[in-house]
């Protein structure tokens, strides 16, 4: 879909009042379910312990390449000048000092630092998977390669960007008055653009889930805006309240840095929750929604889709499943797929599509009931798409389960104890 078409689609949906209200409620419930503030606190705690190993890895990678080594100081200065509150600037000196002392570490100490960094990165991935309702994770080796690639290439790309920008701003064009104005504007906008690009790529790469650009971009915009507001708010507060320096003295930067890291994670996770909500939200009229308690009907229809896809020798992507079965929500689809993956019935291929991993002749309804823990509904409800082929066979299978159960449930509770006697 073209960017202009996507924007027009968003505007059209925003004018649909019922859809907008429904999405607002859905988004609020997702915010509450994700427990973002608690997750941000946990990530802030682990991030503090990962700052030193992160600095060691980044500066170590840059020092390994002479062409990048001389840009490490400029990179550090740029990061702390544009992304960290001035009151926490003292942390830069400590991190550089710790990085310079990395050569004195023993092998066990270095391994401990790397492990703490990997734990932090793993915590970030787990939090993002939780936000996107992904139950499965990448294989350990794949995760390690992704983390290492992001750290090493990220450091080199950042240093290379500084080098290129320095060469560009040294051109005669930027020596004129108009050129200086343009350079000043670019320098002001660069931190915001960097935040936006980094967060967008984070939303695309980190979750073990296919995140589309049209969902990642709005979340990244929200996160970048919140980050700028937080940066301005902390600066305004610290500028009018100086008592913290008298209270904490030379370590005054520590609580400020902790607060800044926490608020950064709050902004990023709020943006991630918006992105996942946009991908998961499916607006349907009431008559086309799957009634609560009839998820087993949706499960049988879902397996029917996989049965037909397997006969054609192909898999099904999440978007295609939701298009074929619009009654399913993204959250329900992810829950069902993860449950079926646990019993080896589904698996993902290298393209992220779901495939049947076992023949359905080897699976009983009892297996489905035990792995999903879905209820067998008793009351009559209007079910969407009950008259198509999948609807008829799924409803017939469900009736075979629930109609005898309905008769059994008509039994009086007192009948259970009729023959038990008067005493326990």
UniProtKB/Swiss-Prot annotation:
<comment type="similarity">
    <text>Belongs to the UPF0761 family.</text>
</comment>
<feature type="transmembrane region" description="Helical">
    <location>
        <begin position="101"/>
        <end position="121"/>
    </location>
</feature>
<feature type="transmembrane region" description="Helical">
    <location>
        <begin position="48"/>
        <end position="68"/>
    </location>
</feature>
<dbReference type="InterPro" id="IPR023679">
    <property type="entry name" value="UPF0761_bac"/>
</dbReference>
<dbReference type="GO" id="GO:0005886">
    <property type="term" value="C:plasma membrane"/>
</dbReference>
<feature type="transmembrane region" description="Helical">
    <location>
        <begin position="251"/>
        <end position="271"/>
    </location>
</feature>
<keyword id="KW-1003">Cell membrane</keyword>
<feature type="transmembrane region" description="Helical">
    <location>
        <begin position="216"/>
        <end position="236"/>
    </location>
</feature>
<keyword id="KW-1133">Transmembrane helix</keyword>
<dbReference type="InterPro" id="IPR017039">
    <property type="entry name" value="Virul_fac_BrkB"/>
</dbReference>
<keyword id="KW-0997">Cell inner membrane</keyword>
<protein>
    <recommendedName>
        <fullName>UPF0761 membrane protein Smal_0716</fullName>
    </recommendedName>
</protein>
<keyword id="KW-0812">Transmembrane</keyword>
<feature type="transmembrane region" description="Helical">
    <location>
        <begin position="144"/>
        <end position="164"/>
    </location>
</feature>
<feature type="transmembrane region" description="Helical">
    <location>
        <begin position="181"/>
        <end position="201"/>
    </location>
</feature>
<keyword id="KW-0472">Membrane</keyword>
<dbReference type="Pfam" id="PF03631">
    <property type="entry name" value="Virul_fac_BrkB"/>
</dbReference>
């Amino acid at each position: 879909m073209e960017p202009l078409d996507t924007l027009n689609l968003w505007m059209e949906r925003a004018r649909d009042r019922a859809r907008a209200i429904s999405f607002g409620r859905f988004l609020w419930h997702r915010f509450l379910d994700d427990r973002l503030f608690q997750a941000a606190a946990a990530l802030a705690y682990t991030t503090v312990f990962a700052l030193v190993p992160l600095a060691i890895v980044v500066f170590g990678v840059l020092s390994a390449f002479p062409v990048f080594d001389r840009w490490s100081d400029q990179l550090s200065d740029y990061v702390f000048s544009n992304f960290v509150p001035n009151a926490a600037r003292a942390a830069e000196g400590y991190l550089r000092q710790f990085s310079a002392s990395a050569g004195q570490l023993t092998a066990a100490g270095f391994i401990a630092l790397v492990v703490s960094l990997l734990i932090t990165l793993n915590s970030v991935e787990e939090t993002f998977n939780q936000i996107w309702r992904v139950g499965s994770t990448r294989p350990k080796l794949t995760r390690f390669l992704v983390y290492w690639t992001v750290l090493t290439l990220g450091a080199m790309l950042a240093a290379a960007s500084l080098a290129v920008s320095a060469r560009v701003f040294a051109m005669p064009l930027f020596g004129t008055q108009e050129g200086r104005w343009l350079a000043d504007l670019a320098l002001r906008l660069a931190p915001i653009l960097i935040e936006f690009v980094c967060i967008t790529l984070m939303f695309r790469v980190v979750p073990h889930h296919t995140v589309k650009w049209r969902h990642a971009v709005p979340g990244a915009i929200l996160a970048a805006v919140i980050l700028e507001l937080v940066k301005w708010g902390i600066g305004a507060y610290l500028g009018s309240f100086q008592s913290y320096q008298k209270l904490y003295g030379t370590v005054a930067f520590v609580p400020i840095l902790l607060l800044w890291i926490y608020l950064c994670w709050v902004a990023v996770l709020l943006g991630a929750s918006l992105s996942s909500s946009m991908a998961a939200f499916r607006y349907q009229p009431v008559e086309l929604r799957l009634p609560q308690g009839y998820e087993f009907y949706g499960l049988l229809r879902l397996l029917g889709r996989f049965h037909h896809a397997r006969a054609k020798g192909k898999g099904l992507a999440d978007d295609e499943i939701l298009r074929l079965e619009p009654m399913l929500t993204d959250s329900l689809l992810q829950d069902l797929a993860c449950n079926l993956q646990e019993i080896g019935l589904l698996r993902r291929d290298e393209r992220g599509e779901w495939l049947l991993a076992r023949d359905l002749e080897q699976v009983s309804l009892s297996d489905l009931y035990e792995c999903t823990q879905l209820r067998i509904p008793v009351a009559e409800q209007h079910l969407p798409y009950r008259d198509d082929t999948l609807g008829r066979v799924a409803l017939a299978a469900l009736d075979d389960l629930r109609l005898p159960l309905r008769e059994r449930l008509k039994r009086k509770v007192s009948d259970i104890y009729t023959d038990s006697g008067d005493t326990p």
